C-alpha cells in the first residue's frame, strides 16, 4: 500500500491533471487515511470506516483521469467500473456484487506478482540450472544416477556466465514447460457467476493441471518461461489467497463512474425500475456486507468507494437518500477555461503537443508549437465548447487531430522537413470551422 503523504499525492496528480485542486486534495486525504487506519490498534481499527467520496463535475474535466492516476499511485487493489453496466437483481445484466469479485481477482493477481518478485532471484537461478542441465547434461555413473560435483564444474560456470551475459540468447533448445490449461468457457446466466467459476475450475482439473510438454524455443524465451514456472513453485497459493483477501478488505478502492446515469431524474416519469434498483443493490456494498467469491468470503466494510458523475440530466439529490448518506464527502470539479486548455497542452507529462512532436519525429519531421499557436488552439477548443456541447478537455483531442491531419498524412513524404505551428497556421486550418457553428457541430 502507498505510504505517500497527501502533499506528495497531489504533487504527483499535478503532473498529469491540470486544476481541480479540491478533488485532488479529497482523494489524497482519503488515500492517506487508508494508511493511517492501519497504524491504529486492532480494536479501534475496526471502528474506523472510510469516508466515501462523490465527485461532481461536467464531462471532460478530469474525474476519470484522477481515477486512472490514483490506481497507479495507490499500490492497492483498485477497480474502476461504469455504473451503467449493472442492472438490478432479476434483470438481464451484471450484478453489482461482480464488482467485488473482480476486485478480488485484481488483488489475487497483484499479490501473486509481488510474491513472485520477492523470489525472482531464486527462481532465475533454478531456471538457469534447468537450462544448463539441457546444455550440459550431468555425467552419470554406472547405475545411471547423476554424479555429484558436476554442478560446480568449470565448464558449467563458464556457460552460466555466458547465459547471464546474453551470449547464448539466440541458441535454440528443447525444454519441458508447463502446458497451457485448456480453457472451458461457460456462459453465465445472471446471478450464477460463482457456480460457473466453480464448474470452470472443475473442468480444468479434470483436463490435468500439471502436464508438461516439450517445446523448442530460444534460450532467452526459455529463461523467461522457466523463471515464471519456478517462481510459481516457490510461492504458497493458500498464503497468497489469505494476503490478497486481507488487502482487498482493508485497502481495496472501488471507483464507480457515471453514477448520475442511474439516477431517476426529477423530470422522469418512465417506469425505469432497474436504475433505482442498482442504487439499492449498491447500498449494502457501500455500507458494508459480505460477498461470496471463488477465493472465499470478502467483507466490504472498510473498502473505499469513490463515485463520480456529470449530473447534467439529474442532480446529486436525485440519488436515493440512503446512498447520499453513504457518500459524505462531496467535491465539485470546475469547468475548464481557455487558460486551463493552454496549460493542458503543455504542462502535463506526455502532453498532447509532446505526443504529436514525438509521433512525427519517427518520420524525421520536426514539429514546433509556438506560444501564440498553443494559445490559438486553446481558444479554438474553448470557443467550440461554448457554442456547441461542452465536452471539456476531450475537445482538445478533436481539435488537435483536425489541426495535424494534413501533416500526419504527408509525413512519410516530408522526411527531414520542419513545421512551425503558430497562430497563423492554426487559423488557416481551424478558423472557418470554429467560426461556423454548424460545421463545428459536425466536424469538431
From Swiss-Prot:
One of its GO terms (molecular function) is ATP binding. Its main location: cytoplasm. GO terms for cellular component: HslUV protease complex. Coiled coil: none annotated. InterPro entries: AAA+_ATPase, ATP-dep_Clp_protease_ClpX, ATPase_AAA_core, Clp_ATPase_C, HslU, P-loop_NTPase. Keywords: ATP-binding, Chaperone, Cytoplasm, Nucleotide-binding. GO terms for biological process: protein unfolding; proteolysis involved in protein catabolic process. It is found in: Cytoplasm. Residues 147-157 have a biased composition (Polar residues). ATP binds at residues 18, 60-65, 257, 322, 394. Residues 141-161 are annotated as: Disordered. ATPase subunit of a proteasome-like degradation complex; this subunit has chaperone activity. The binding of ATP and its subsequent hydrolysis by HslU are essential for unfolding of protein substrates subsequently hydrolyzed by HslV. HslU recognizes the N-terminal part of its protein substrates and unfolds these before they are guided to HslV for hydrolysis. Belongs to the ClpX chaperone family. HslU subfamily. A double ring-shaped homohexamer of HslV is capped on each side by a ring-shaped HslU homohexamer. The assembly of the HslU/HslV complex is dependent on binding of ATP. This is ATP-dependent protease ATPase subunit HslU. The lineage of its organism: Bacteria, Pseudomonadati, Pseudomonadota, Gammaproteobacteria, Vibrionales.
